[in-house]
């Protein structure tokens, strides 16, 4: 994939991003305008640099989820449809879960991997984690021939994705009409992502909005997305959009997921808050969470993801757990 830069500020963002990726052993580099146009002949001449990784790839999340489901059921998973936990109680070193279907389950461990709804599960224990839904609106195009060799993101999309809550958004992009449109784009958390699919449709996004559980799409935001993609890829001016949709990402204030056993609640584990990286990080999250549940030391440090960082000031956790 590529993260494209339109100006020197964007290049600085990309340089920091690439340096971080390289420190972790990932094969990512910055390429010049000539190489960009070899990969993407339709991109605007305003793009001056880009990140590039030949190892970047994408998956269909629905097929991935189906694969996880089939693999897990083959190993003994029981999947309960149309049921939700209504109470969650520690009982003599185990957990009792009462479901909306009237069924009661007993287990030694509970893993809260409920995504944007994870805090609702925590609420059953009197806990509160700042895991909140962050809406993303997306345009879907008609089927097209391939427009380039990779998926494309803007430097500002990376900033929007990684920027912790409360940090000012980037300024006006060159395609915006002025400060008012820049303000609206900042309110929507606008970033640029241009992703092809195996069927030939392109997904164009996206916003990052703190809008609760509202998944409606907004014409004003969609219009900004359309204008933005035409700026990066002028060939898109005559392309038809066939539908729109919005989804929810489970976000945290510091941009890090919450992974680990909750202090004071033995056997209750968090694995949520990955925002838009949940699909990419699902295999490793499953592995380290399984290690924790089984009492093994994970291969990787989970220090940055500790649940404790969000629990200060929430009273006596041991008393809450025993209650």
Question: Could you tell me what each predicted segment is?
Answer:
Residues 32-33, 81-83, 243:
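Short loop/edge segments at beta-strand edges and connector loops
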Residues 1-39, 192:
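Dinucleotide-binding Rossmann-like beta1-alpha1 core, especially the glycine-rich loop
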Residues 104-105, 114-244, 248-263:
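Active-site substrate-recognition segment that forms the wall
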Residues 37, 85-87, 244-249:
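Short, solvent-exposed loop/turn elements at beta->coil junctions and helix N-caps
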Residues 13, 40-47, 89-96, 251-255, ...:
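A short, glycine/Asx- and small/polar-enriched loop/turn
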Residues 30, 35, 77, 95, ...:
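C-terminal lid/capping helical subdomain adjacent to the catalytic/cofactor pocket in oxidative enzymes
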Residues 51-109, 117:
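Helical element adjacent to the flavin cofactor pocket in flavoenzyme catalytic cores
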């Amino acid at each position: 994939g590529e993260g494209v830069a339109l100006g020197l500020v964007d290049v600085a963002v990309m340089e920091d991003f690439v340096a971080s990726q390289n420190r972790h052993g990932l094969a990512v580099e910055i390429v010049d305008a000539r190489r960009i146009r070899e990969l993407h002949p339709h991109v605007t001449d305003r793009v001056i640099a880009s990140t590039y990784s030949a190892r970047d790839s994408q998956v269909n999340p629905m097929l991935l989820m189906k694969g996880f489901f089939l693999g897990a059921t083959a190993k003994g998973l029981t999947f309960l449809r149309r049921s939700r936990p209504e109470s969650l109680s520690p009982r003599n070193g185990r957990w009792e879960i009462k479901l909306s279907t009237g069924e009661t389950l007993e287990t030694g461990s509970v893993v809260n991997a409920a995504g944007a709804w994870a805090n609702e599960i925590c609420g059953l224990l009197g806990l509160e984690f700042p895991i909140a839904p962050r809406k993303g609106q997306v345009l879907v195009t008609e089927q097209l021939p391939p427009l380039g060799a990779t998926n494309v993101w803007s430097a500002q999309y990376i900033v929007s994705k990684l920027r912790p809550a409360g940090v000012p958004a980037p300024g006006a992009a060159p395609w915006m009409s002025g400060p008012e449109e820049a303000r609206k784009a900042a309110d929507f958390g606008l970033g640029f992502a241009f992703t092809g699919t195996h069927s030939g449709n392109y997904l164009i996004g996206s916003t990052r909005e703190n809008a609760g559980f509202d998944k409606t799409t907004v014409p004003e935001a969609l219009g900004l997305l359309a204008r933005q993609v035409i700026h990066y890829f002028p060939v898109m001016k005559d392309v038809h959009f066939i539908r729109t949709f919005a989804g929810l990402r489970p976000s945290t204030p510091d941009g890090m997921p919450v992974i680990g056993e909750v202090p004071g609640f033995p056997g209750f584990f968090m694995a949520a808050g990955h925002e838009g990286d949940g699909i990419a990080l699902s295999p490793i999250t499953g592995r380290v969470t399984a290690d924790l549940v089984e009492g093994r030391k994970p291969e990787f440090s989970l220090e940055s993801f500790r649940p404790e960082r969000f629990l200060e000031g929430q009273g006596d956790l041991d008393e809450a757990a025993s209650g």
